[in-house]
C-alpha cells in the first residue's frame, strides 16, 4: 500500500437507510483513498451527518474522491471538505504557561520580587540547586537549522517550526518533558555549535532535529564532547533505535538470529550510518552498506562497517536489508532473495512495497509508516534526565531498542506509538543502562 500524505475531512449526509455509509466507503476506496476516523455529527429523523477523515496522495486524487461521492446521488450529499491538519496548527501547538497562579501580592512576592532574590542567591552559592528550584532539570532544547525537514529538504528553520512544536508536544505528553524549540538562521557548523553551547545552561538536554548531512555528524560529535549534558541527533539515533527494535521484532517473526545475520544498509546519510552503528553496538558482526557517495562509504568503514559497491551486491550478500534512501522503487523484486528480512523505511513511498517484497520471497517486509521516531526520543530523554546522565551513549540506545522490541506484540514490527507503557519501559531501560554505566 502506498503511504498517503494529504488528510481531509469530508462532512457527508446520508439517508437513514442501511448500506449508504458502505456506498460512500466503497466509492472512496475504489479510488485509493484511505478512510480514517468516522465521526457521527448528527442523527436526524431521516438522515445521518458524519465527518469522514480521508487520506489521499495528492490534490488530484482528492478531487477524484470528491467527484465520486458527489456522483452517488440518492440523497447522499457532500457538505464540506475541511483541512483539519491546518486548523490544528492555528496559533501553534504549544505554549509556555505558569505552573503557579498569581492571585495576590503575597503570591507575587513569592514567585517574583522580592522573594525570588533568595532563590537566586542560593543557586549562586550552590549551582546544583538549580536542578531543584528551576525548570532546567526537565527542559530539553529542540534545535534545528531547517536544512533537512522531514522529506521536504532545506526549507529553513521557520518553515520547520511545526515539526519542532510537534516534538515538544510529544515530549510533554509522552515523557512529561518541557521541549523548547530553538530555530537557528545559520547552517554553519561552527556557529551552530557555538550557539548551542551558549544556550546550554538553560537546559538539561539537547535534541538536534532535522539538521542535514554531513554537517550533522560534526555538530553532534563536537557538542557531545564539549557539553556535560545529553545530546542526541534524532534523525540519526532516534531512527536507529526504532529500526533496531523493528529488526529484532522482524527477526523474531521470521526465525532469524539477528546477531548472527548479515545486515545491509542501503543509503548512508545521517540515518543510514547511525543504523549501521546501532546494529554493531547491538552485537551484529557483519554490517554492510552502500551509497552513491564515496565519502559516506568511507565514513561507514571508519565506524567498522563494510562498504559494497552496489545494491545488487548488498542484496545478494545480506540476510537483513534496511533502506533509507528516499528513492521509491529502488529495490527491484528481482533483487530479493528467499528468506530475507526487508525494512524499506523511506516515506512517503518505500524503496519496495512490502507486498512486492513478500511476493518475491522475503520472509518479512515492512515500510516506514510504522517505524516512527516517536517510539524513541521521549523515553530516551526521560531516562537520561532521570539518571542525571551527562550523555546518551550506545548502551542506553540499545537498551531503548530492546525495550521497544519487548513491548511489541508477536506479528507486529513495533508497538503503537502512543502507548504510554512503551515510553515508561523505554525510560526505565535507558535510566538503568545509564546508572549501570556510572557504577
Curated annotation (Swiss-Prot):
Catalytic activity: (S)-malate + NAD(+) = pyruvate + CO2 + NADH; oxaloacetate + H(+) = pyruvate + CO2
Entry note: cofactor: Divalent metal cations.
Domain of life: Bacteria
Cofactor(s) annotated in UniProt: Mg(2+); Mn(2+)
Catalytic activity, EC: 1.1.1.38
SUPFAM superfamilies in the record: Aminoacid dehydrogenase-like, N-terminal domain (SSF53223), NAD(P)-binding Rossmann-fold domains (SSF51735)
Domain ACT as annotated: residue spans: 9-84
Keywords, in A-Z order: Magnesium, Manganese, Metal-binding, NAD, Oxidoreductase
Induction summary: Weakly expressed in glucose or malate minimal medium.
Keyword Manganese: yes
UniProt binding sites for NAD(+): 268-271, 347, 373
Keyword Oxidoreductase: yes
One Gene Ontology term of the molecular function aspect: malate dehydrogenase (decarboxylating) (NAD+) activity
Gene deletion effect: Mutant can use either a gluconeogenic carbon source or glucose as efficiently as the wild-type strain. The ATP concentrations in the mutant grown in minimal medium with glucose are similar to the wild-type level. ATP concentrations slightly decrease in malate minimal medium. The mleA-maeA-malS triple mutant shows a decrease in ATP concentrations by about 20% and a moderate growth defect. NADPH overproduction is roughly halved in the deletion mutant.
Ligand binding (a divalent metal cation): 209-210, 235
Annotated catalytic residues: 112, 167
Assigned protein family: Belongs to the malic enzymes family.
Function: Catalyzes the decarboxylation of malate to pyruvate. Is specific for NAD, cannot use NADP. Can also catalyze the decarboxylation of oxaloacetate. Involved in keeping the ATP levels high.
The protein, known as: NAD-dependent malic enzyme 1
Amino acid at each position: 500500500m502506498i503511504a498517503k500524505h494529504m488528510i481531509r475531512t469530508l462532512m457527508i449526509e446520508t439517508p437513514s437507510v442501511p448500506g449508504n455509509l458502505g456506498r460512500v466507503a466503497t466509492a472512496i476506496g475504489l479510488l485509493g483513498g484511505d478512510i480514517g476516523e468516522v465521526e457521527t455529527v448528527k442523527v436526524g429523523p431521516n438522515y445521518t451527518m458524519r465527518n469522514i477523515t480521508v487520506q489521499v496522495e495528492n490534490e488530484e486524487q482528492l478531487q477524484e474522491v470528491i467527484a465520486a461521492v458527489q456522483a452517488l446521488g440518492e440523497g447522499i450529499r457532500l457538505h464540506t471538505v475541511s483541512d483539519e491538519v491546518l486548523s490544528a496548527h492555528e496559533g501553534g501547538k504549544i505554549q509556555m504557561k505558569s505552573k503557579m497562579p498569581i492571585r495576590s501580592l503575597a503570591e507575587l512576592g513569592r514567585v517574583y520580587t522580592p522573594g525570588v532574590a533568595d532563590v537566586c542567591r542560593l543557586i549562586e552559592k550552590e549551582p546544583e540547586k538549580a536542578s531543584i528550584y528551576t525548570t532546567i532539570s526537565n527542559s530539553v532544547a529542540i534545535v534545528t537549522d531547517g536544512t533537512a525537514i522531514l522529506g521536504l529538504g532545506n526549507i529553513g528553520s521557520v518553515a520547520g517550526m511545526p515539526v519542532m512544536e510537534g516534538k515538544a508536544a510529544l515530549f510533554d505528553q509522552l515523557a512529561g518533558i518541557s521541549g523548547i524549540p530553538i530555530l537557528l538562521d545559520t547552517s554553519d557548523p561552527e556557529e551552530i555549535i557555538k550557539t548551542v553551547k551558549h544556550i546550554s545552561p538553560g537546559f538539561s538536554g539537547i535534541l538536534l532535529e532535522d539538521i542535514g548531512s554531513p554537517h550533522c555528524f560534526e555538530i553532534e560529535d563536537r557538542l557531545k564532547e564539549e557539553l556535560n549534558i545529553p545530546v542526541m541527533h534524532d534523525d540519526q539515533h532516534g531512527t536507529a533505535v526504532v529500526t533496531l527494535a523493528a529488526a529484532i521484532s522482524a527477526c523474531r517473526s521470521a526465525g532469524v538470529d539477528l546477531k548472527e545475520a548479515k545486515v545491509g544498509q542501503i543509503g548512508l546519510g545521517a540515518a543510514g550510518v547511525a543504523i549501521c552503528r546501532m546494529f554493531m553496538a547491538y552485537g551484529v558482526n557483519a554490517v554492510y552498506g552502500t551509497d552513491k557517495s564515496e565519502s559516506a562509504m568511507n565514513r561507514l568503514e571508519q565506524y567498522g562497517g563494510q562498504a559494497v559497491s552496489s545494491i545488487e551486491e548488498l542484496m545478494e550478500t545480506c540476510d537483513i536489508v534496511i533502506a533509507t534512501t528516499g528513492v521509491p522503487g529502488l529495490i527491484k523484486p528481482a533483487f530479493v532473495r528467499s528468506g530475507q528480512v526487508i525494512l524499506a523505511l523511506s516515506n512517503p513511498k518505500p524503496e519496495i512495497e512490502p507486498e512486492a517484497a513478500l511476493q518475491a520471497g522475503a520472509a518479512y517486509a515492512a515500510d516506514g509508516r510504522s517505524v516512527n521516531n516517536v517510539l524513541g526520543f521521549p523515553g530516551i530523554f526521560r531516562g537520561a534526565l532521570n539518571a542525571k546522565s551527562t550523555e546518551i551513549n550506545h548502551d542506553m540506545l540499545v537498551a531503548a531498542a530492546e525495550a521497544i522490541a519487548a513491548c511489541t506484540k508477536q506479528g507486529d514490527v513495533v508497538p503503537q506509538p502512543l502507548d504510554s507503557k512503551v515510553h515508561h519501559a523505554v525510560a526505565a531501560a535507558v535510566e538503568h543502562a545509564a546508572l549501570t554505566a556510572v557504577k
